[in-house]
Curated annotation (Swiss-Prot):
Location of this chain's protein in the cell: Cell inner membrane
Main location: membrane
Protein name from the UniProt record: Lipase chaperone
Keyword Chaperone among record annotations: yes
Transmembrane segments: 12-32
GO CC terms of this entry: plasma membrane
């Protein structure tokens, strides 16, 4: 019975997480950093510390070694690397006057190309980025602006790897002072290299990291009672911009929906019953999709019962005639005949174990 629910629950959880990101557009990641809420101040502190440490230690989470690890070579490729093949670069946004818009989407454009850092030399990467800038903005004032921002972004990376190791770990705990110093250094570096672009590029990340750090400090403060920690966490959250608070509420609703759906499935509520009970949390479209996933899982479960019955009958007949390897081949052939949709046979095999 546990296996029966674990697979469909996993699918629904993934669907809800993706829906949360797409529909809500949240910047605050759906991860263990949010495990510490105002009702559970003692949860996941080691994991939270590790996550924040990784982000700070690698430099804004995803950028430290992007350029520093590239081999020194001037070869420029004539085609896109495999990591970018078949994809399209994000558009560079413009404001109403034709200038490059000061928004985070500009960083997204450059980060798209930086995903191929391990496949390109610095010269090749620069050539590809420049080519795409010209392709999108040829003849516009934003062309030179985009090229200047790219140069600044590269300068940020080259200086980032030169920052000293701050020794942010003391034993098995974070050194909060060192982490704060590291965040301050990165913020200062961003301003020096990117100027006014530091805010649209790193503002949201820096705000989230500092917020996470303050939550960690509160959760780790042994002088505070659980009730005092809850109050301080509430006060800290109230300092967030209203938009961020709204997004956090949406994320919490998603988490509540996941818990509710898992319980409804354990109670063997029908797909339509699930849809009616979660539509208020998820909206009609997502609730319908969750119910459909449940409905398809019920169909699969019936198919698996039919398969298991046939497998058991054959096992009794063939037990005295086939070697173990031959028996396994027969079972695999039976799976392939009954489970025709992608992934079904593999799922059946996992339940056979």
């Amino acid at each position: 019975m546990i296996k029966k629910y674990s697979f469909v629950n996993h699918r629904i959880v993934l669907y809800l997480i993706l829906g949360c990101v797409v529909v809500c557009g949240v910047w605050y990641s759906f991860d263990v950093r949010q495990a510490i809420d105002v009702g559970a101040v003692d949860l996941s502190l080691p994991q939270m510390s590790n996550n924040l440490l990784k982000e700070v230690a690698v430099g804004e989470g995803k950028t430290t070694n992007r350029l520093s690890r590239l081999p020194v070579d001037s070869t420029v490729p004539t085609v896109l690397p495999q990591s970018l093949a078949g994809s399209i670069a994000p558009p560079l946004p413009l404001d109403a006057y034709g200038h490059l818009a000061r928004v985070s989407a500009v960083r997204d454009f450059f980060d798209y190309f930086l995903t191929a850092q391990n496949d390109l030399t610095p010269a090749a990467l620069d050539e590809i980025v420049t080519h795409e800038i010209v392709k999108q903005l040829h003849g516009k004032s934003a062309q030179a602006e985009a090229q200047d921002v790219w140069t600044r972004y590269c300068a940020y990376f080259s200086q980032l790897v030169k920052l000293p190791d701050m020794g942010m770990v003391l034993g098995d705990k974070l050194d909060f002072v060192a982490v704060q110093r590291a965040l301050d250094q990165r913020a200062s570096l961003a301003v020096r290299t990117l100027g006014d672009w530091s805010e649209p590029f790193f503002g949201a990340e820096q705000q989230r990291q500092r917020y996470d750090l303050e939550r960690l400090k509160i959760a780790d403060d042994q002088a505070l009672t659980d009730e005092q920690k809850k109050k301080r966490l509430v006060a800290l959250e109230q300092k967030l911009p209203s938009k961020v608070q709204e997004e956090r509420i949406k994320i919490q609703q998603q988490q509540d929906a996941v818990v509710k759906i898992i319980q409804l499935q354990k109670d063997e509520v029908t797909p339509d019953g699930i849809r009616l009970q979660v539509v208020g949390l998820l909206g009609p479209e997502v609730a319908y999709r969750v119910a459909e996933i449940r409905r398809q899982d019920e169909i699969w479960q019936e198919k698996y019962k039919h398969y298991a019955a046939q497998r058991a009958q054959r096992a009794q007949i063939e037990a005295q005639q086939l070697e173990p390897k031959e028996h396994d081949v027969q079972v695999e052939n039976l799976r392939q005949r009954i489970f025709t949709k992608p992934g079904e046979a593999l799922r059946a095999a996992s339940l056979d174990q």
